[in-house]
Amino acid sequence: MMLIFSVILLSSCTRPKQSVEEKGKYDLLFGASSTAGMAYQWVTAFCELINDHSDTVQASAITTLGSSENINLLAANEIDAGISTNIVASTAMLGEADWAGHPVSGLNIVSYMYADYCYICVPKNSPAETLEDLCGKRVNIGEKGGGVYTGMVEILKALGLGETYFKPYYLSVSDAVSSMQDGALDAVFIYGSATNSSIMELQASKTGLKVIGFTPDEISTICENNTALKPVEMNASYEGIPPVSTVGGAMCFMATEKLPVEVSHELCRILDEYHDEFVTNTRWAETSTPANTAGLTGGLIPLSEGTAQYLREIGID
């Protein structure tokens, strides 16, 4: 997998960026995530939709570590589009955390995908009920360079905490779940969608699953200190898990100012006109609508020019 990934990136670094008019079809390279999450399913289904219905864009997806790596690949002009949570993209634009001293400029939003959430997964029989109960415990906070890690660091910072509040581990979600099943981890942080195939496997195993959110005071503090996050009630897609009070934001697909206007416009058109087909292929596309994209107007990260143009054409400002 990594060899294939490297080859794709090498070719993308050297290929010229040509307009649709010059090239006939724009070759869009789309950074997804690991194969375990909703984002990968969304991106691969959307690429198929583009290839089936666009006369001007040809799309292909690559696996990545997710939001943080995609932002870096966009900044390096190694991909044309990539998924990212708004908290990670905002952190990069502000030049904070991993981007301290070298903020990423020129990011824009092509479309809203779905809501994202922060939650904590522990074994079903765990005595932990709150974040505080995990102080000093063995907790996975995500792979460094990945979106889960960046999101969690920002949330901990908003609470006045650091990684060393726990005994931190830096594993992928799938590896963290395996470690938890072996008794080597006490908790796994998730920052992303309300479902994850690795967490579903955890729930189905003898270890079982309990999901922890945040207390009202923690939610208030987080949202006061990080405006990219809002209080939310997460209806988890894990059977038998009750709604979880937590914080969340938006998963979007991003580009930079280098993506031609006509390409981002075409992507929005395909997403809108063939939305029913998209939802048939992946239910995670249900909320990927022009109205939800328009709701992101006015944030730190602007909508792409092609997106704004398309929204005006269909009467959504």
Located regions from the model:
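A structural signal for short loop-to-beta-strand junctions that line the ligand-binding cleft
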Residues: A100-M113, C118, A236-S245
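Short, low-complexity disordered leader/linker segments with a strong preference
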Residues: M1-D27
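Pocket-lining segment of extracytoplasmic ligand-binding domains
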Residues: N86-V88, G95-D98, S126, E163-L259
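N-terminal (or domain-start) structured segment
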Residues: V20-T91
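An extracytoplasmic/periplasmic, membrane-proximal ligand-sensing/linker region
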Residues: L171, D175, D182, G192-K206, ...
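Extracytoplasmic
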Residues: K25, T56, G66, A76, ...
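Bilobed "Venus flytrap"/periplasmic-binding protein-like clamshell domains
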Residues: K25-H53, V57, D116-D182, T297, ...
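Ligand-binding clefts/hinges and TM-proximal coupling segments of bilobed small-molecule sensing domains
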Residues: K137-E154, N226-G299
